[in-house]
């Protein structure tokens, strides 16, 4: 991986790291809110629509298996280019899907591309950014994704409203991915002028030969801190699955759903840098625990509102509260994994840590879909809320042990 001195300026990462993340986030943000509605239009029931919505995080989990190896072998830039090309293919497949199963495969591939894309930028930031401002830098990276998830739903809703076609949200993703490719191909990457060891040779020398080997070698920290990160991932993925499903179940249109999700994403985006300041000044714990408790309580509240006369108003309020709570924890998974990763070759560990977080992110919406199939969406929502509060306790116990707070200089 790259090596770096402490002569760092934020503008040096703005275009090579943050702009591609923003564009990719816009594309994802346009597509995610309408996935359950499109799945329903292709013949899926409410539980089936939830299952298809979960495919994006299942794809991310599958992508975590080779992503650390891929980034270590071919580098961050080439990995992002490959991920952008895969996402274009996935969304094209979604546009031409003739049934729910084909659409689900497309969403899975989109998640796969997102995993490689995200890890490539995180690996670059981990080695390029000094430790003294790492949390702020990684929160800013997370904020660039969140800015995309904020802008994407609004652009998607606008296009759907103007054209009357939900397919325009998918076309927006393709456009964003093409721009990402252009940016990556023509823009200078700071890593090109930095000392770079032979990552393939280093990878073999350090015997970082695979994801599951890395997981085994770091099983202690991954069980204790990674399990909590898995709950964080589960809460976030459940939010992205439950809110659009809830909108379908109370009869909201695709355009209205995208607008409400966008409002929640705006609250999320507004707090990304504040999250980094909290982590750098007070410690990682004071970001993640309030975030998880806030999201858990919001989901518990939502679970009791489905049949109330003001169900739509409650839905809007909860979407905003969840956005605020998630924003307070912006960048926490990337920051914790960067804190714990070895400096010389962080990508395999980052992939392993992301795998544990994405395992939770994949299991949570699958569990939601299963509970909806046998019981109700309200029960599934309440259970996820309780698990979120329990996860806050796991991290409150283990973060001080593995990542003791050191005040920024």
PLM-predicted stretches and their roles:
Residues 8-54, 221-228, 233-246, 250:
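Helix-loop boundary and gating motifs at the non-cytosolic
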Residues 28, 110-121, 321-333:
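Core transmembrane helices of Major Facilitator Superfamily
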Residues 63-75, 271-284, 372:
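Helix-to-loop junctions at the C-terminal end of transmembrane segments
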Residues 108-145:
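Cytoplasmic helix-loop-helix junction between adjacent transmembrane helices
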Residues 169-185, 381-396:
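Symmetry-related core transmembrane helices of the 12-TM Major Facilitator Superfamily/SLC fold
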């Amino acid at each position: 991986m790259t090596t770096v001195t402490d002569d760092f300026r934020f503008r040096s990462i703005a275009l090579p790291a943050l702009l591609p993340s923003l564009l990719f986030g816009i594309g994802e943000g346009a597509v995610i809110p309408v996935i359950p509605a499109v799945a329903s239009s292709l013949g899926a029931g409410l539980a089936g629509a939830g299952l298809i919505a979960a495919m994006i995080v299942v794809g991310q989990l599958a992508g975590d298996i080779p992503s650390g190896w891929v980034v270590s072998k071919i580098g961050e830039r080439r990995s992002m280019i490959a991920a952008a090309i895969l996402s274009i293919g996935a969304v094209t497949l979604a546009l031409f899907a003739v049934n729910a199963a084909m659409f689900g495969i497309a969403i899975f591939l989109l998640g796969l591309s997102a995993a490689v894309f995200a890890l490539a930028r995180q690996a670059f930031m981990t080695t390029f950014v000094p430790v003294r401002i790492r949390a702020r830098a990684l929160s800013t990276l997370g904020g660039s994704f969140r800015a995309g998830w904020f802008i994407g739903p609004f652009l998607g809703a606008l296009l759907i409203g103007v054209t009357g076609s939900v397919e325009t949200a998918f076309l927006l993703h393709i456009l964003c991915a093409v721009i990402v490719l252009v940016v990556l191909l023509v823009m200078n990457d700071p890593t090109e002028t930095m000392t770079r060891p032979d990552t393939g040779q280093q990878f073999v020398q350090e015997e970082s030969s695979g994801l599951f080997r890395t997981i085994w070698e770091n099983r202690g920290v991954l069980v204790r801190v990674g399990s909590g990160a898995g709950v964080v991932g589960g809460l976030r993925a459940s939010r992205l699955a439950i809110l659009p499903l809830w909108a379908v179940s109370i009869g909201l249109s695709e355009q209205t759903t995208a607008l409400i999700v966008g409002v929640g994403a705006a609250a999320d985006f507004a707090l990304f840098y504040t999250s980094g300041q909290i982590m750098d000044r007070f410690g990682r714990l004071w970001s993640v625990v309030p975030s998880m408790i806030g999201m858990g309580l919001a989901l518990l509240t939502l679970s009791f509102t489905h049949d109330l006369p003001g169900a739509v108003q409650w839905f809007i309020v909860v979407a905003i509260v969840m956005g605020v709570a998630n924003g307070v924890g912006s960048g926490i998974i990337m920051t914790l994994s960067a804190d714990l990763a070895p400096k010389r070759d962080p990508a395999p560990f980052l992939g392993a840590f992301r795998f544990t977080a994405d395992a939770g992110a994949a299991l949570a919406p699958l569990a939601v879909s299963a509970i909806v199939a046998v019981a109700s969406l309200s029960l599934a929502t309440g259970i996820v809320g309780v698990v979120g509060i329990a996860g806050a306790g796991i991290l409150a116990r283990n973060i001080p042990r593995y990542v003791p707070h050191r005040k920024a200089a």
